[in-house]
Amino acid sequence: MDFHVMTLFPDMIMDGLNTSITGRAIKAGVMSVKAYDIREYSNDKHLKVDDYPYGGGAGMVMRAAPVCDCYEDIVRNIGKRPRVVYMTPQGYTFTQSMAEEFAKEDNLVILCGHYEGIDERALENIVTDFVSIGDYVLTGGELPAMAVSYTHLTLPTTERV
């Protein structure tokens, strides 16, 4: 399986997944992981990706344009529109059966939010699954994204390293 992680912190993803069992799995070709830096898709000279929520509200959200542009780049790279999992505390709780369902995909995009979340317009355009790893809030979706990636290696259908 190929994981494509959309994040503001690509080093956090790659450092976390390139170690231990997942690191060996990546080296052995059992799985691949590419982290996309959403900031690289900002058209702002300061690479700003946050803004006030469209329609008002408290806090800041990730802007729709950089998120959607990043996704479109992934689509161009793999040649199809893959399943997109948005890691959010408001999502369905991640389960073993969900891991098995995701494992049927050749490519899985995981979208990591920050701030108060992501502009709803981006979520409506690209997200297929809203997933949570528990009933608590973290500062971003990177740790949940790594948890989803790790579970792929525990499935009976996954080649052992």
Predicted regions and their residues:
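Short, structured active-site "lid" loops
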Residues: 49-69
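Short, glycine/polar-rich helix-capping loops at beta-to-alpha or helix-loop-helix junctions
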Residues: 116-123
